[in-house]
């Protein structure tokens, strides 16, 4: 069933911290990773090959074509811009969501350790703090090592020069040298809002130079079929535009 999402733990950081105080020698990030590991060991992940095929198919379709098939309602705000130089022209993956306190990246660190190959980490920056970067070079490099398919942050980053050399798409609202808090609270794999769009864990994220599209998993098969048809039509219109016969509608 291509519309069956993978089952993953939802991690409320504040609740975990209250229930399981970390040891004196253990910092909070290490503690959260340990707790997440306990959850992961008891959770059976399910992701069918048909679902992965959907992601591969969406990676061949420009976000503009997808947006046109969805009533232009699932595109993130243009404040979220591409900062890296990834290989290819369109990128897609499965959303791993993070709800983060404004300017705090504690739960983003935990999500990086929790993420699997092909995931796209999507972060809401609650409160809109814009003078604290949520990620930098070390985290970008680790995300590339983990073979993630993208990072989408509704907040700023730093180490922009390094970001340009990272081979995966990195989207953010801007840059600042200011560092993040690392205190929490936050949650992983819960519904969030990023770039003005609702994102649920397991949704399909499609990215290109134009921006970021979110496709609800339950709609993915129908959206894919419609977008593929529209792409064929648009390609024919481009050819016609080259000889002056296109219907521009």
Locate predicted features:
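Feature captures the catalytic cores and cofactor-binding loops of soluble hydro-lyases/lyases
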Residues: 35-201, 215-249
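Channel- or pocket-lining gating/hinge segments that regulate access to a cavity or pore
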Residues: 210-213
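Short hydrophobic targeting helices and cationic amphipathic motifs
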Residues: 2, 7, 28-32
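Acidic, Ala/Val/Gly-enriched low-complexity intrinsically disordered segments
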Residues: 3, 13-17, 23-26
